[in-house]
């Protein structure tokens, strides 16, 4: 009698065992992966738990996100998706990043044009503030003129992002192989090389963007006409004006951005809070502040770059004749329009 319950329960136990095996088969996962190295590519996301030696701690998984408004002035590679070996995710991020960048740059186009206008035409004798600059632009070309140059600014998003991501991925694989995560220093170097390469290739588009942003009503018929006039009147070298200060600007931007971000991490650690899971507001504030400081550090070179890109032999830029950034930087340091520089720097940030 004692063996009969075992015979009646044996089939049900087998069924339970079978279901457990099927469930285990479909939910089977490999060993837990090592903690991912954060993609602190100086302009976008997380470095918590990495810079300060917390490599053994598991970080919460997070989807790729861009936490800084794209106005076209961010230098470093701003993505998390590069850490994922998934080309589909990369292209999805490229598409979503391009669409978001187009919206954000279009929304900030009036301020961007006012900034460039103030950077080029302001001087100690010709003081210009934000309202005065916007008023001058509207009087010259109307409300629609505030969006001049926005087309090329949006158009260069796709090649800029694609070159940055491709070069970054190749450099990362070269440093540490395809399936290994590079140290933070090598990741920073890979990001800098990617930015330098992309800026080298799209510098002609930057010059066209500056010229179209500053153009008078009826000066150019469009993008191709602007490029044709530059090539005919100034030569091919004009398309690479401002290249040197643009490259030099990567150094103070990257170093300042990184230093501020690490300082904020130290403050977060000393506060006794959990570093592994900072809130979205904390992460956004840290990235925004570090990026702002980086832009402030590189702003003098950005100003020199813009003035060199705007100069020309004919047209409204004929009063500018700088072929070397050093004389222009020296002139700005000895006789700066302080108030106007502050206003245009605020718009730049």
Swiss-Prot record:
Residues forming coiled coils: none
Classification lineage: Eukaryota, Metazoa, Chordata, Craniata, Vertebrata
Main location: mitochondrion
Entry GO CC: mitochondrial inner membrane; mitochondrion
Reactions catalysed, as given in the entry: Mg(2+)(out) + phosphate(in) + ATP(out) = Mg(2+)(in) + phosphate(out) + ATP(in); ADP(out) + phosphate(in) + H(+)(out) = ADP(in) + phosphate(out) + H(+)(in)
Transmembrane regions: 88-104, 149-168, 188-205, 243-261
GO molecular function, one term: ATP transmembrane transporter activity
Gene: SLC25A41
Family (UniProt): Belongs to the mitochondrial carrier (TC 2.A.29) family.
UniProt-listed Pfam families: Mito_carr
Function: Calcium-independent ATP-Mg/Pi exchanger that catalyzes the electroneutral exchange of Mg-ATP or free ADP against an hydrogenphosphate and participates in the net transport of adenine nucleotides across the mitochondria inner membrane.
Subcellular location: Mitochondrion inner membrane
Protein name: Mitochondrial carrier protein SCaMC-3L
Domain of life: Eukaryota
Keywords tagged on the record: Membrane, Mitochondrion, Mitochondrion inner membrane, Repeat, Transmembrane, Transmembrane helix, Transport
Membrane topology: Multi-pass membrane protein
UniProt KW NAD keyword: no
Any one biological process term the GO annotation gives: ATP transport
Solcar repeat residue numbers: 88-174, 182-267
